[in-house]
Every structure is written in C-alpha cells, then in structure tokens.
Amino acid sequence: NYAGGKIVGSNKSNATGVNISTVSNNISNVAKTDSAITEDTDLSSSSKMDVEAVATAALPAMVQLNGTTTVKSSSYFGYGQSYEATSSGTGIIVGKSDTELLIVTNAHVVDNIDNLKCVFSDGTSASCSVKGSKLDQDIAVAAVSLSDISSDTASNIAIAELEDSSDIKVGQQVVAIGNALGEGQSVTTGIISAKDRSITVNNVTFTGLLMTDAAINSGNSGGALLNSEGKVIAINFAKTSSDGVEGMAYSIPVSNVKDIIDSLMTKQTRNKVSSDKAEYLGIAAVDITSNYASYYGYPVGILIRTVADDSAADKAGLETYDIIVGFDDQTVTTMSGLTNML
C-alpha cells in the first residue's frame, strides 16, 4: 500500500506576500540552521543518533501536501456516484528559484489532486502547483510561489540537503518524518533493514528500494528518510500492510532519482485549469496495463483507438493503434493521467 492516503488533513489560511530577497536571506540549508546540527556535534561517528538534533534541523524543510480528489463509488446494482475526498501527503523543500520554492514528493501524492495546498512548519499554507512528475519512479516536483510566502514563514523555512545514498549500510540508523494520517508532521526512528528491494504497487514494480523498520503510515508518502547528519537519503513512499506483517516500509534512494529531480525542477510550473479550458488532444484510447503489456509484448501506455479529424493529435501525425508512452518528457501510463497533464 502507498503510504500516502486519502486522509483528512488540516489547512490554515494562505500566507501573505513577501519580498523575494527576504526569502533568500531567511531560507537556509538544514545542515547549517542555528538550532540544529553544528560543527561541534559529530553525529556521523556517534554510536547513537541524536534524533532530537536531526528532527530540529529537518522539520522546517518538511511540508504537508493536502488536496482533494474525486472518488467514484459503485453499488450492487451497478449504479455509482462521485464524491470529493481529501488527500494528504508530505513534501520536502529541496531548493528555490528566483520566484518559486521547490518541493519534492511522490507522484501519487499530487497526481489527479485538486486544490493542492502546501502547509509549512509554522502552520501557514499556500497554493501549490506541480512542475512535473515521473510516474514509473513515483517522483514529482511541486512549487510554491515565493510571493505567496510571508517573511515570517520564510524565516522558519529550511532547505533540505539531498545526500548520495549509494554507501548506505544495512543496520544504519535513520529518522523518518512525514504527515502521518494527515495530522501534521511526526518523527519516527529505525534502521535500514535491507537494500535493493522490489515491490509492486498498482501493477507497477519499483526496484532498488531501501527497506526500513521506521514507522511509515498513510500520509507519510513523499516524506524524508534522514541519516544522522540530517540529510535526506531517501523518499518514503510505501509499506507492506497485512496481518502478521510489521516493520516493512520502503523508501526511494536519492541516488536513484537525483537526476530526475534535477530535471523536474527546471520544468515550467503547471497550473491546473477547469476541464473547459484544458487542451484538447482529439483521441479515444484505452490503457495498456502492465499485465496486458507483458502478455502481448506491448509497452505500458495508452493505445489509440480513434483519432478525430483535424484535431491536434491528427495534425501531429498520431494514428489508430499508436501507443503513447510519454508526454513532455514524462511517463504516461493511463488516459486519465494524460488528461490530467493536459
């Protein structure tokens, strides 16, 4: 199960505007915050992690990502109705541009989510937009306009440092931070239980994962797994959930997705619009799931059934039985996902 659930979160009113230069002066690297880890604290060589120091340093770099999604229910008689549900996850502040604060999270935390809000450590919130995502790696980058962040909030924000995770050892102590159950950030501890693990979620197989016994719950998706120096070594995203199973949570190592994150950070921010203003592609298509793909030897993607005459798809040269596997350098696996991108 994904660690990001459709759980009620709590949002507060948006922050007021702030001068960009003020944000630049106030936002600092986690490893350099005054209240956190100092040069005199040799945590890396300590036999016991200073969890309080790590949490103090990292919490200002963590955000809640809350929004809404449309859920379709079904009944015994075949009739169903749609209703709006709340969704909660976690994000990690990893950088900023001249105009935006940049946040890394899981793709499933922000995919098909409306009214996306970012809640900072001081409780203030701001509208959040998606810059891009890589669904087959479950990684996304979102952005908040610096003009939507007050100077007070900016002074409490930190930027997390992404650490090379290739030298992580089994048994190494770690700290996990995330918006568990949509109730705000919480801190848990554990160790690296295993490396290079694979799991399948919603017919997509993820490989090269870290397994940890640190408690990871719904809402923790997109949160940080930190080493003793307060640096992000992995991004929490899933856990094994069944009777008799405990302590099997999974995180995506930073080293596996650093290039993807860097690429997504440079993309143009996408502001979601109403369906009547969305771009029209002009195709009817069906999803090729991983099961169908493996059986027929097709790639996972969208199989075009028809192309409307004189549509954008027609003008671009798309034809019946073509398979769409990507859009704007992003992986496409479902028609609904493509529609959401448009």
Enumerate the predicted regions with their spans.
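C-terminal recognition in membrane/secretory proteostasis and scaffolding
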Residues: 1-25, 107, 129-130, 227-233, ...
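N-terminal activation segment of mature serine protease catalytic domains
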Residues: 2-79, 85-90, 114-115, 169, ...
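A conserved glycine-rich beta-strand in the N-terminal activation segment of trypsin-fold
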Residues: 44-53, 72-102, 124-129, 159-161, ...
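Extracytoplasmic/secreted envelope proteins and their assembly/folding machinery
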Residues: 51-62, 88-90, 139, 168, ...
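Terminal peptide-recognition signature
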Residues: 60-65, 91, 101, 105, ...
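Short, conserved beta-turn/loop elements at beta-strand boundaries and strand-helix junctions
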Residues: 68-71, 96-98, 112, 133-137, ...
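Active-site loop architecture of trypsin-fold serine endopeptidases
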Residues: 72-73, 80, 84-85, 113-116, ...
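Conserved active-site neighborhood of the chymotrypsin/trypsin-like protease fold
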Residues: 95-185, 332-333
